[in-house]
Amino acid sequence: MFIGEYQHALDPKNRIIVPAKLRDGLGNKFVITKGLDGCLYAYPLDEWRILEDKLKTLPLTNKDARSFVRFFFSGACEVELDKQGRGLIPQNLKEYAGIEKDIVSIGVLSRVEIWSKEKWSEYNESNIDFDSIAEKMNDLGI
């Protein structure tokens, strides 16, 4: 399980330096893809396989399902870290997430979300009504 928030930056060669606490769970090789809300999602390989299996069951006849699978898999790639915990994020994914230098990585249960520092700040400063969200979670039994 991934938890916590970590602020860091791309190195001079535009590589992400994965914080040690997140690296332990992700492993030296993981999958990164376009996430929702303008961030990137990083999954350990075993979690990625579970997600693949679930998405394979979506009906091809459903347009929204096809669109989501295309969105999710078209940006996906494996990232392999070097001994210092650095890995290269493809340019198309950096552009999608608006990542230029400063990064915030957050642990979210089975995945790591990678945000540009600016987008993460905007997200947290937006008018999200957490009380309303909490009420909806109650409706889901949480």
UniProtKB/Swiss-Prot annotation:
Pfam families: MraZ (PF02381). GO terms for molecular function: DNA-binding transcription factor activity; transcription cis-regulatory region binding. Gene3D superfamilies: Transcriptional regulator MraZ domain. It is found in: Cytoplasm, Nucleoid. Residues 5-47, 76-119 form the SpoVT-AbrB domain. GO terms for cellular component: cytoplasm; nucleoid. NCBIfam families: division/cell wall cluster transcriptional repressor MraZ. Forms oligomers. PANTHER family: TRANSCRIPTIONAL REGULATOR MRAZ. Belongs to the MraZ family. This is Transcriptional regulator MraZ. It comes from Clostridium beijerinckii (strain ATCC 51743 / NCIMB 8052).
